[in-house]
Regions:
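Short hydrophobic/aromatic beta-strand micro-patches
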Residues: 7-9, 44-48
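Short, surface-exposed ligand-recognition loops at beta-strand->loop->(often short) alpha-helix junctions
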Residues: 8-17
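A common structural junction motif
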Residues: 26-31, 61-67
Length: 76
């Protein structure tokens, strides 16, 4: 079995409301010097073949109109 990690995040130029909310709260919590926050999600899969993971991302895991994704192979 192969292990794959898919990182999904909003595309550049798309409003990331969660990221903006965290970014706005940081100074009030004493965190200075952090200028840009983007929040996404991580999906980890185990599969016999990873050939169709990109297709899975396009059709189910990510919204290709507003999200980018990156596929990483996880080494044991």
């Amino acid at each position: 079995m192969s292990k794959v990690r898919v990182l999904i995040r909003p595309k550049e130029g798309i409003l990331d409301a969660q990221g903006k909310a965290v970014e706005s709260a940081l100074p009030g919590l004493g965190f200075e010097g952090i200028e840009k926050v983007r929040i996404g999600r991580i999906v980890e899969l185990e599969a016999e073949s990873t050939e169709r993971v990109g297709e899975l991302c396009e059709k189910l895991l990510a919204n290709p109109l507003i999200e980018d994704y990156e596929i990483e192979t996880i080494e044991d």
